[in-house]
């Protein structure tokens, strides 16, 4: 299966790359089509914790995009209450089979660091981000401290 070969190589490349904002990326014991990892943001307000993520690859990968899910709650306009992310690079309209998982994860880090209120999954948070930015940042930081995992050393 082409997906297996490619995912094996991509996972190996990601582990070797040692991105400071992504830790413990690994595939599940049951399937190479499901990865988990820890997102460790560097910018406020999310730099007070770490967020468990899950990446699910369809059997048709790389011809179909993966799906990313936050397993840790996050106060973010581009992530809904179920943990689903609005990430243009993995939308069916924008997906290209040449896109690598590392690029997807870099886009995820970028959207966490710089929310895009113009593409919200939570319009209430997008509005707060735009209209009451200081309040949003304070609430997001408190939410992160309360709900996020401890940051790795």
From Swiss-Prot:
The active site is at residue 86. Residues 2-149 form the UBC core domain. The keyword Transferase applies. Its EC number is 2.3.2.23. GO terms for biological process: protein polyubiquitination; ubiquitin-dependent protein catabolic process. Pathway: Protein modification; protein ubiquitination. GO terms for cellular component: nucleus. GO terms for molecular function: ATP binding; ubiquitin conjugating enzyme activity; ubiquitin-protein transferase activity. Keywords: ATP-binding, Nucleotide-binding, Transferase, Ubl conjugation pathway. The keyword Lipoprotein does not apply. SMART domains: UBCc. It catalyses: S-ubiquitinyl-[E1 ubiquitin-activating enzyme]-L-cysteine + [E2 ubiquitin-conjugating enzyme]-L-cysteine = [E1 ubiquitin-activating enzyme]-L-cysteine + S-ubiquitinyl-[E2 ubiquitin-conjugating enzyme]-L-cysteine. Gene3D superfamilies: Ubiquitin Conjugating Enzyme (3.10.110.10). It holds the Pfam family UQ_con. InterPro entries: Ub_conjugating_enzyme, UBQ-conjugat_E2_core, UBQ-conjugating_AS, UBQ-conjugating_enzyme/RWD. Belongs to the ubiquitin-conjugating enzyme family. Catalyzes the covalent attachment of ubiquitin to other proteins. PANTHER family: UBIQUITIN-CONJUGATING ENZYME E2. This is Ubiquitin-conjugating enzyme E2-18 kDa. It comes from Drosophila melanogaster (Fruit fly). The gene is Ubc84D.
């Amino acid at each position: 299966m082409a997906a297996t070969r490619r995912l094996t190589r991509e996972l190996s490349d990601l582990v070797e790359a040692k991105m400071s904002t992504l830790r413990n990326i690994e595939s599940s014991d049951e399937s190479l089509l499901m990865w988990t990892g820890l997102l460790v943001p560097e910018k406020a307000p999310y730099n007070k914790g770490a967020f468990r993520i899950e990446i699910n690859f369809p059997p048709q990968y790389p011809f179909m995009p993966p799906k990313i899910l936050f397993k840790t709650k996050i106060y973010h306009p581009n992530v809904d209450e179920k943990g689903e992310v609005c990430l243009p690079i993995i939308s069916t309209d924008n997906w290209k089979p040449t896109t690598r998982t590392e690029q997807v994860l870099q886009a995820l880090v970028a959207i966490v660091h710089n929310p895009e209120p113009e593409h919200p999954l939570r319009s209430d948070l997008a509005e707060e981000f735009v209209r009451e930015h200081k309040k949003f940042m304070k609430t997001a930081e408190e939410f992160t401290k309360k709900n996020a995992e401890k940051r790795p050393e």
